[in-house]
Regions:
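A charged N-terminal "starter" segment
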Residues: 1-107, 112, 381-387
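Glycine-rich tight-turn/loop motif centered on a GG-T
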Residues: 23-34, 118-124, 159-166, 201-208
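Aromatic/hydrophobic pocket-lining residues that form π-stacking "cages" and hydrophobic walls in ligand
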Residues: 45, 135, 214-217
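Active-site-proximal beta-alpha core segment in soluble small-molecule metabolic enzymes
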Residues: 57-192, 196-198
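Structural beta-strand/beta-sheet cores of well-ordered domains, especially the beta-sheet scaffolds
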Residues: 122, 146, 183, 229, ...
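Active-site loop/helix belt of alpha/beta enzymes
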Residues: 154-268
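Active-site loop ensemble at the mouth of alpha/beta enzyme cores that anchors a bound cofactor
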Residues: 237-317
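C-terminal accessory subdomain/extension
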Residues: 290-387
């Protein structure tokens, strides 16, 4: 999906990854991340958000819940980390990093609510009154007021399978009335997902019905004299989409893919955020005229199509196609069109969610100074593997 953008925006990353691989420093099935470019992308996002009065929570799941990189990004001025599930929150807190937003996309389990409240989580999203009551009890016990967001939806909204949740919009007044009865809670705002999506036919990011529902819910409360401070609209957050979010009165967004430049809008390599990561593998064997590289990092929604194959003997890079991958099977190996020498390096660049892969994550700095250096190795869940 992003091979052409990678070649256009960050050819130095390709060279650095192949050089480190030739030195035996990077193994197959590794996401190689250009740390300096991620930080540059992060700065651009912060600067753009400030122009439009939007606060940004940092999302880490796309780059493998990586605490080292998260800490560097937080220093740029992000309002905190958003943990999309309780295991991501655990990784961040164990690394000494505070979690600003938790509960969306995945609710906090009952026996972890008290810890999330006591740890000082800025805001917690709730999908049910039952969960709101758990948060209320924990807040009272901790002697603090916990800010909460309500996730809302309407019947015609788009929800990904496995993410069906929230309060239906027409019940919002009744829900808010119940929330206001709960001690220790402050209703800070509303959220939904996905609020923006890339439209391939239009060639741009467009608002979803979900964003309209979110805005309508805010206006619905305002007419009843209930003002909210936070309108959180995640999905497809980027330098290009932030102005659109501002037009809708959005106050908070949560960039993830934009940090690595792997947003659908950047397929041609023409966005302010530059590609900052690639997936490196190696030819394992041949079968019936095609080559198979080591798998582990395939993501079925990644739109991976093209690969670069590097043969050390002649220092040649050849572009080929990734053949059809059976999404119902484990990606032990991935098929590439044509025969290439065994143990040649393979580079792909596609949309991923590293935390659901088996990949290693290799952090590299100094690429654009011509001095690439590995500064950290992690697994796909943010656990250090040493330098």
């Amino acid at each position: 999906m992003f091979v052409e953008a990678l070649k256009r925006q960050n050819p130095a990353l390709i060279s650095a990854a192949l050089s480190l691989w030739q030195q035996g420093k990077i193994a197959p099935d590794s996401w190689v991340i250009d740390v300096d470019q991620v930080l540059e992308n992060g700065k651009r996002l912060i600067e753009t958000a400030r122009l439009y009065g939007i606060e940004l929570y940092l999302m880490t799941k796309q780059f493998g819940r990586n605490p080292w990189l998260a800490e560097k990004l937080l220093a740029l001025g992000y309002s905190g980390i958003v943990a999309v599930d309780y295991k991501e929150a655990r990784v961040m807190r164990r690394a000494g990093l505070s979690v600003a937003h938790q509960g969306h996309l995945v609710q906090i389990p009952c026996h972890q609510v008290a810890d999330a409240v006591e740890q000082g989580t800025d805001i917690i999203t709730v999908f049910t009154l039952d969960k709101a009551r758990e948060v209320s009890a924990a807040a009272v016990k901790a002697g603090r007021v916990q800010f909460v967001l309500l996730k809302v939806y309407s019947d015609d909204d788009f929800l990904y399978p496995g993410q069906e949740s929230g309060f239906v919009q027409h019940s919002l007044h009744e829900v808010v009335a119940e929330i206001k009865k709960l001690p220790g809670l402050h209703l800070a705002g509303l959220t939904h997902f996905p609020c923006l999506l890339w439209d391939e036919a239009a060639g741009k990011v467009l608002p979803t019905p979900n964003l309209h529902t979110l805005v309508q819910a805010r206006d619905q409360l305002a007419k009843s004299g209930i003002a909210i401070e936070q309108l959180n609209a995640p999905s497809a957050t980027s330098c290009t989409s932030l102005p659109m979010l501002a037009e809708y009165g959005v106050t908070h967004a949560e960039p993830g893919h934009a940090l690595t430049g792997t947003i659908p809008a950047n397929q041609q390599g023409d966005q302010p955020e530059y590609i900052a990561m690639l997936w490196l593998s190696e030819i394992s064997h041949h079968f019936r005229g095609d080559s198979y590289c080591y798998g582990g990092g395939y993501y079925r929604r990644g739109h991976a199509q093209h690969a670069l194959v590097f043969t050390p003997e002649n220092q040649k890079i050849t572009e080929t196609n990734l053949k059809t991958v059976d999404d119902s099977s484990i990606d032990y190996t991935l098929p590439l069109a044509g025969e290439f020498p065994v143990s040649s390096a393979v580079v792909l660049c596609f949309r991923t969610q590293i935390f659901v892969t088996r990949s290693d994550v290799v952090l590299v700095s100094g690429i654009h100074r011509g001095e690439p250096k590995i500064v950290g190795r992690y697994d796909s869940l943010g656990n250090s593997l040493g330098a």
